[in-house]
Amino acid sequence: MTHQTHAYHMVNPSPWPLTGALSALLMTSGLAMWFHFNSSMLLSLGMLTNLLTMYQWWRDIVREGTFQGHHTSIVQKGLRYGMVLFIISEIFFFAGFFWAFYHSSLAPTPELGGCWPPTGIHPLNPLEVPLLNTAVLLASGVSITWAHHSLMEGNRVQMLQALLITITLGLYFTLLQASEYFETSFTISDGVYGSTFFMATGFHGLHVIIGSTFLTVCFFRQLSFHFTSNHHFGFEAAAWYWHFVDVVWLFLYVSIYWWGSYSFSIDPMQLTSN
């Protein structure tokens, strides 16, 4: 091994970008086969190889940063920029769902009955399970901040307690969201309301599951003493991601659950005259 005279991480050759690309190809091809031929075998294979690739790739990153010392302050700065750009891309991802919802609801077409929610759709009560979900996620935002401050102060026990509370609240939110889906009187195939509702809330639920997994990994890493008060970007990235999930839910609650549940109609004569 040659002597390194700079603070940058020169990565070693890795098979994971190639296996990740191949698994993504299998997943997208498998998704098309599932839609058209009702066969989920290729999709399952793609998901399995993708999960294995992610596990082994992130395992190598943990080894490089925690045990080999490659994540210097300059490298961590680059990782922070990368995480910020990733969250920005996620913002635009969800912006598409909000755009579709408001485009359809602010000027409902005659096919929808000229009203919103569309004729025949009975929206969920925003003051029941959605409000409880909001309280759960806001509480999880408080507990993850508590965990972060405890880590900064070197209080390992409180950090683990707060992190476990956050993970539990994330699991509780997921269970509430799943129970809510079973109670809805509409499905994803019930026009534009059903498709935008389930796409937006479903992808948010997927992000909650991903964030909970991220935090669970951080919990076990903290049990193994991987984090210190000045070297914990893995946890910091998970906390940023969780706060992003919180903020997206607030927009979802206000837009889709609260504002979108109030009925209003448009006079068809006004549409034709304009």
UniProtKB/Swiss-Prot annotation:
PROSITE patterns: COX3. It is a multi-pass membrane protein. One of its GO terms (biological process) is respiratory chain complex IV assembly. SUPFAM superfamilies: Cytochrome c oxidase subunit III-like. GO terms for cellular component: mitochondrial inner membrane; respiratory chain complex IV. It is an enzyme of class 7 (translocase). The keyword Methyltransferase does not apply. One of its GO terms (molecular function) is cytochrome-c oxidase activity. Residues 35-40, 106-128, 184-190, 257-274 are mitochondrial intermembrane. The chain crosses the membrane at residues 16-34, 41-66, 73-105, 129-152, 156-183, 191-223, 233-256. Residues 1-15, 67-72, 153-155, 224-232 are mitochondrial matrix. Keywords: Membrane, Mitochondrion, Mitochondrion inner membrane, Translocase, Transmembrane, Transmembrane helix. It comes from the Eukaryota. It catalyses: 4 Fe(II)-[cytochrome c] + O2 + 8 H(+)(in) = 4 Fe(III)-[cytochrome c] + 2 H2O + 4 H(+)(out). Its main location: mitochondrion. It is found in: Mitochondrion inner membrane. Its EC number is 7.1.1.9. Belongs to the cytochrome c oxidase subunit 3 family. Component of the cytochrome c oxidase (complex IV, CIV), a multisubunit enzyme composed of 14 subunits. The complex is composed of a catalytic core of 3 subunits MT-CO1, MT-CO2 and MT-CO3, encoded in the mitochondrial DNA, and 11 supernumerary subunits COX4I, COX5A, COX5B, COX6A, COX6B, COX6C, COX7A, COX7B, COX7C, COX8 and NDUFA4, which are encoded in the nuclear genome. Component of the cytochrome c oxidase, the last enzyme in the mitochondrial electron transport chain which drives oxidative phosphorylation. The respiratory chain contains 3 multisubunit complexes succinate dehydrogenase (complex II, CII), ubiquinol-cytochrome c oxidoreductase (cytochrome b-c1 complex, complex III, CIII) and cytochrome c oxidase (complex IV, CIV), that cooperate to transfer electrons derived from NADH and succinate to molecular oxygen, creating an electrochemical gradient over the inner membrane that drives transmembrane transport and the ATP synthase. This is Cytochrome c oxidase subunit 3. It comes from Lemur catta (Ring-tailed lemur).
